[in-house]
Structures are given as C-alpha cells and as structure tokens.
Amino acid sequence: MDGFDAVLKAAQRGDEWAVAVLYRDVRPRLARFLEVREPKAAEDLEGEVWLAVAQGLARFSGGEESFRAWVFSIARRRMADFRRTAVRRATFPAPTEELDRPGAPGPEAIVLEELSADAAAEFVIATLPADQAEVVLLRVLGGLGVNEVAEILDKRPGTVRVLQHRALRRLHAALVGTGVTR
C-alpha cells in the first residue's frame, strides 16, 4: 500500500491527521481555482466543497489523482449550483476584502500579495475561449492529468490535449504580441 492509500484509509476511518494531510494537499489548488473561476464566492464554495468531501469520503475509492479529480468535480458542480442560484436571485455577495474595515490591510496590499498568480489566471481567462481556459486552469491550478480533466469536463482525453495545445499556442502568440517573451 503506497502513502496515499494509507492516508486515505486513515481519513476514511476518521483519523484527523489523515484528513488534514488530504486537505493540505488539495486546498491551495482548489482555493486558487475557485478564486479564479468565481472570485466573489470562492470562500463559500470552498466550504461547500469540503463539506461534500467530508460527507462522501467514506464512499470514495481510487488513487491520488482520482481523489483530486473527485474534489474538482465537486467544485465545478458547486460553482454551477451557485451560478444558477445567482441568476435567479440576481445578486452577488461582496467578498470580505472589498468591505471597508478599519485596521484591515488595504486593497493595495491584497493585490500586491496575490498579483502574479491572479494576473496570470486573469490573462488566461481573458485570452482564451472558455473551454480552453478551463482546461488550462484545471491542468495548471488543479494539477490534474489529462484523463482527470477529460472526466471532469465530460470530454475525451484527445479533445483535452487538443484544447490544451491550442490554448498554449494562443497564449504564446498573445505573449509574443505584448513583448513579454522573445
């Protein structure tokens, strides 16, 4: 039994240390993915995702990549639910960072802290068609393999590879056009 299998079994038994290991492994990628795809509700969505993971963990079976793919599948479903609800309500919650709180770091500090990753993700979203951007974000931010992304997006692995290839070519052309690369 490899390391991930042992951690998964312990987490399914309810061992807190094992749940913490799984959380620490996936959380940064999941948080960044949600912040990029749904910045106004990322924290709430992340909480819902982890609640669903906790509820379904005992039934999960698979390896490390399958686990990450499962978590990101849950995240995509929660985003879709959020978007449907938001359209019906026609409101969007304001993130805590945008509220004017005395003593809180200013927006400049928050932006400077997260600028490079957020700017890159925003560039990807602004430059690419939605399907290509989603493939790149799931592959890069999610750290998922082609097969996992294909399963999440309900596409064939070959289609995911083609979308990724086209996306990278388009990003390269955009970067060369702005003088960022040689």
Give the positions of each predicted feature.
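N-terminal module of bacterial RNA polymerase sigma factors
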Residues: 1-28
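Short, charged helix-capping/linker segments at alpha-helix termini
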Residues: 12-20, 31-48, 61, 181-182
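Amphipathic alpha-helical segment used for protein-protein interaction
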Residues: 13, 103-137, 142-152
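Amphipathic, Lys/Arg- and hydrophobic-enriched alpha-helical face
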Residues: 22-40, 56, 125, 177
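Core residues of bacterial helix-turn-helix
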Residues: 23-26, 46, 53, 139-142, ...
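Arg/Lys-rich amphipathic alpha helix in sigma70-family domain 2
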Residues: 36, 58-62, 73-94
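Structural recognition of an alpha-helix C-terminal capping motif at a helix-to-coil junction
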Residues: 44-51, 65-77
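DNA-recognition helix of helix-turn-helix
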Residues: 76, 80, 132, 141, ...
